[in-house]
Design a protein with these regions (language model features):
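Charged helix-capping and loop-helix junction motifs
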Residues: 76-82
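A structural signal for isolated positions on well-ordered beta-strands in alpha/beta enzyme cores
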Residues: 61, 134, 161-164
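A phosphate-binding catalytic loop at a beta-strand-loop-alpha-helix junction
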Residues: 135-149
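Glycine-rich phosphate-binding loops at beta-strand->alpha-helix junctions
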Residues: 66-76
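Hydrophobic alpha-helical packing residues
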Residues: 84-88, 153
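Active-site-facing substrate-recognition patch
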Residues: 1-61, 98-129, 142, 168-171
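PRPP-dependent phosphoribosyltransferase catalytic core
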Residues: 19, 147-174
Length: 174
């Protein structure tokens, strides 16, 4: 699966520069659904779609990767997806995904093991069947979440074209 990211996300432990802090603040503001961050992210993604696909953007479906629960998903992605859909004329797949229950947020889990409390993601199989899908998420570290979600979409008959991320975690070791 092809992937694209706008920024590198560097942990404060490894990079205390003003630039790295600015990226971290942007990512956390986006995760919290802050309007300024949502607007900025949507503008970047709209420009990418328009520059890459032009009038053919309407052939694609943008769907955001599932969050820890439905409340976080809606807060983080609903307005963003609506803005991108309107600005780039891409189809909004978020309206065809439902999240039930809850799992531990992955960015809070040091060992990346998530506890699940009746967590389930339901996809509208009929809607996604035959669609060209691009997945969006805020941060990618290993890519496992995007790959798992891509597999679920493919099981519905979607053709996953790639994934876009605001940032990719940059691992920095001694």
């Amino acid at each position: 699966m092809k992937t694209f990211n706008y920024y590198e996300y560097k942990s404060k432990r490894f990079d205390t520069s003003a630039e790295a802090e600015q990226v971290r603040n942007f990512i956390f503001a986006f995760k919290d659904g802050k309007q300024w961050a949502t607007n900025y992210a949507a503008d970047m993604v709209v420009n990418s779609f328009v520059d890459t696909y032009g009038d053919k953007a309407s052939d694609f479906v943008l769907v955001c990767a599932p969050a820890a629960n439905n409340k976080k998903y809606c807060k983080r992605f609903n307005r963003f997806a609506q803005m991108v859909s309107k600005g780039a004329r891409v189809q909004n797949g978020n309206e065809h995904i439902s999240i039930y229950g809850e799992r531990t947020a992955k960015h809070f889990s040091t060992d990346r093991v998530c506890e699940s409390f009746d967590y389930r993601v339901a996809l509208d199989r009929e809607y996604f069947s035959g669609k060209k899908v691009i997945i969006f998420d805020d941060v990618v570290t290993s890519g496992a979440t995007a790959r798992e979600f891509a597999n679920e979409l493919a099981e519905c008959g979607a053709q996953v074209m790639g994934a876009m991320f605001l940032a990719r975690t940059k691992r920095m070791y001694n």
